[in-house]
Amino acid sequence: MRALYPGSFDPLTLGHLDLIERGCALFGEVVVAVLSNPAKTSTFTLQQRFNQIHVATAHCKGVSVICFEGLTVSCARHNQVDLILRGLRAMSDFEYELQIAHTNRSLAPDFETIFLATAAHHSFLSSSMVKEVARFGGNIDHMVPEVVAQDLHRLFN
């Protein structure tokens, strides 16, 4: 099976990476789809985020990284995946993700969304929180892959 894991990944956290690894173990293949959203201001460019994920997942058999703009279900169809993978850290994530899953299902009834609970030791992580810690000089080495930590240190130091 092939799973699509879409997101902005600005930046990729160890929580994201854990979900990618677990997705590979469960489904065999994970297509990490990096969202280009012109309406959002990103810390890292689309190419930087693509490169960070490519480097951070080099050890994962069955992972491919792509960039996309537009609807997730269009990306899923175009890349011939079987399901959409999403992570849940808390109940607040569930409410938001459930709305998106229902919307995707209304647009493309043939795609299921599978939710995986984030590992407890990563449940506090968010990309925005990581950037905040990095911006003020805090240690982020236990929050993000090494390639991302290096890029954040360069950006904020």
Swiss-Prot record:
One of its GO terms (biological process) is coenzyme A biosynthetic process. ATP binds at residues 8-9, 16, 87-89, 97, 122-128. InterPro entries: Cyt_trans-like (IPR004821), PPAT (IPR001980), Rossmann-like_a/b/a_fold (IPR014729). Keywords: ATP-binding, Coenzyme A biosynthesis, Cytoplasm, Magnesium, Nucleotide-binding, Nucleotidyltransferase, Transferase. The record marks 16 as: Transition state stabilizer. SUPFAM superfamilies: Nucleotidylyl transferase. Pfam families: CTP_transf_like (PF01467). Its cofactor is Mg(2+). One of its GO terms (cellular component) is cytoplasm. It catalyses: (R)-4'-phosphopantetheine + ATP + H(+) = 3'-dephospho-CoA + diphosphate. Substrate binds at residues 8, 40, 72, 86. Belongs to the bacterial CoaD family. Reversibly transfers an adenylyl group from ATP to 4'-phosphopantetheine, yielding dephospho-CoA (dPCoA) and pyrophosphate. This is Phosphopantetheine adenylyltransferase. It comes from Prochlorococcus marinus (strain MIT 9313). The gene is coaD.
